[in-house]
């Protein structure tokens, strides 16, 4: 039992104060097997060893370093307020941190000259991508979107036309951890977008508030919002619901688009292609991606497949880069160029004019 438990461990940072020499041990290296990336592939091995220079903690006399409670408060407050000042006027605001929004932010963040703010009303970003369909664990991704998983390093089981991630949370946690480590990205979770900034017929940012405040406007008064200006807004608010498709619904309310017909009945084969193809700048300054595309165009719903969310998000990122005058896959200025398998999503004749 101990051997089986040990073999499931990956390299750990659980090390610190030196143990007395009499009690110190140096365990043997451990071999770890992870799931195969594709069918027929062998296990991926990693090793872990504890050297004498990096011994385990002495848990018999363990103590944290001292700290004043006020320091904790000041560190959190100072950093958050600094972020609010920094991103009050930014290059791109992404509204919604589901699979499309996170994929968009990840692709955008590869350009270090572009600053990105992600606004997510939930405390927990990820939208519906923590699980597959009907609260099941596995995530199905149709090819060629598996190339994005290869880039992220997410393992999967491979079939001829699709791949399966054993738990959807593997994708979401991986893309999120890689994305948020980049210096040009800030996630503002538990923050809701209540409205858009519009000047001269162009979207120029978002109106924000704490999510809990937005949910209680009927019970409290005088809870005015804040604002974030942006050169480009990417709306990835998902399909219809209390917090769904809010971007395009607001565009209809203020007369910038004529209608939001909503999704048609489920048709996976049509839906995923349509969502990628129709990802575009719907009004000046605002790009729509993910399931919100189906809401504005009346495309079929796609059900529990996620490839279109990833590729639609990436396409939205390159549309935003084009709007910013940065190298991108839409006009062919990106180097190296996009993989040939994904180019169909960016062909000029496949992009609907805004």
UniProtKB/Swiss-Prot annotation:
GO molecular function: cysteine-dependent adenosine diphosphate thiazole synthase activity; iron ion binding; protein domain specific binding; protein homodimerization activity
Statement: the UniProt record of this protein carries the keyword NAD: yes
EC nos: 2.4.2.60
Residue numbers binding substrate: 100, 120-121, 128, 193, 224, 239, 291, 301-303
UniProt entry keywords in alphabetical sequence: Chloroplast, Iron, Metal-binding, NAD, Plastid, Thiamine biosynthesis, Transferase, Transit peptide
Keyword Transferase: yes
UniProt-listed Gene3D superfamilies: 6.10.250.2840, FAD/NAD(P)-binding domain
Tissues expressing the protein: Highest expression in developing embryos and green leaves and a very low level expression seen in endosperm, roots, etiolated shoots and immature ears.
Cofactor detail note: Binds 1 Fe cation per subunit.
Organism superkingdom: Eukaryota
One Pfam match: Thi4
One Gene Ontology term, aspect cellular component: mitochondrion
Cofactor (UniProt): Fe cation
Broad class of enzyme this protein falls into: transferase
Span of chain positions assigned to the transit peptide in the UniProt entry: 1-45
InterPro entries from the UniProt entry: FAD/NAD-bd_sf (IPR036188), Sti35 (IPR027495), Thi4_fam (IPR002922)
Reactions this protein catalyses: [ADP-thiazole synthase]-L-cysteine + glycine + NAD(+) = [ADP-thiazole synthase]-dehydroalanine + ADP-5-ethyl-4-methylthiazole-2-carboxylate + nicotinamide + 3 H2O + 2 H(+)
Primary location recorded for the protein, binned into one broad class: plastid
Modified residues (2,3-didehydroalanine (Cys)): 222
The record's account of how the chain is modified after translation: During the catalytic reaction, a sulfide is transferred from Cys-222 to a reaction intermediate, generating a dehydroalanine residue.
Location of this chain's protein in the cell: Plastid, Chloroplast
Family: Belongs to the THI4 family.
Subunit annotation: Homooctamer.
HAMAP family in alphabetical order: THI4 (MF_03158)
Functional note: Involved in biosynthesis of the thiamine precursor thiazole. Catalyzes the conversion of NAD and glycine to adenosine diphosphate 5-(2-hydroxyethyl)-4-methylthiazole-2-carboxylic acid (ADT), an adenylated thiazole intermediate. The reaction includes an iron-dependent sulfide transfer from a conserved cysteine residue of the protein to a thiazole intermediate. The enzyme can only undergo a single turnover, which suggests it is a suicide enzyme. May have additional roles in adaptation to various stress conditions and in DNA damage tolerance.
Name of the protein in its database record: Thiamine thiazole synthase 1, chloroplastic
Underlying gene: THI1-1
């Amino acid at each position: 039992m101990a051997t089986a438990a040990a073999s499931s461990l990956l390299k750990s940072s659980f090390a610190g104060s030196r143990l007395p020499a009499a009690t110190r041990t140096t365990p043997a290296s451990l071999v770890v097997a992870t799931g195969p990336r594709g069918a027929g592939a062998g296990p991926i091995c990693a090793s872990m060893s504890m050297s004498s220079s990096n011994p385990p903690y002495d848990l018999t006399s363990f103590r944290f370093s001292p700290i004043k409670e006020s320091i904790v408060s000041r560190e959190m407050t100072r950093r958050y307020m600094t972020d609010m000042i920094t991103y009050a006027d930014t290059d791109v605001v992404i509204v919604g941190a589901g699979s499309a929004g996170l994929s968009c932010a990840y692709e955008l963040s590869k350009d270090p000259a572009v600053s990105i703010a992600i606004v997510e009303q939930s405390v927990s970003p990820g939208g519906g991508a923590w699980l597959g369909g009907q609260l099941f664990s596995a995530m199905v991704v149709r090819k060629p979107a598996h190339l994005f998983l290869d880039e992220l390093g997410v393992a999967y089981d491979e079939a001829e036309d699709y791949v399966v991630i054993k738990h959807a949370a593997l994708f979401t946690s991986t893309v999120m951890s890689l994305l948020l480590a980049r210096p040009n990205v800030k996630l503002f979770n538990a923050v809701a977008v209540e409205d858009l900034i519009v000047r001269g017929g162009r979207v120029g940012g978002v109106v924000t508030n704490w999510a809990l405040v937005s949910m209680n406007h009927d019970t409290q008064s005088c809870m005015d919002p804040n604002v974030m200006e942006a050169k480009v807004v990417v709306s990835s608010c998902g399909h219809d619901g209390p917090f769904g498709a809010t971007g395009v619904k607001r565009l209809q309310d203020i007369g910038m688009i004529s209608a939001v017909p909503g999704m048609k009945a489920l048709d996976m084969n049509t839906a995923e292609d349509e969502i990628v193809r129709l990802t575009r700048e719907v009004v000046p300054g605002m790009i729509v991606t993910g399931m919100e595309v189906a809401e504005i165009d009346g495309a079929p719903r796609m059900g529990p497949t996620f490839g279109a969310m990833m590729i639609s998000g990436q396409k939205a990122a390159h549309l935003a880069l084009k709007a910013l005058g940065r190298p991108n896959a839409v006009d062919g200025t990106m180097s190296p160029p996009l993989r040939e398998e994904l180019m169909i999503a960016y062909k000029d004749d496949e992009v609907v004019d805004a």
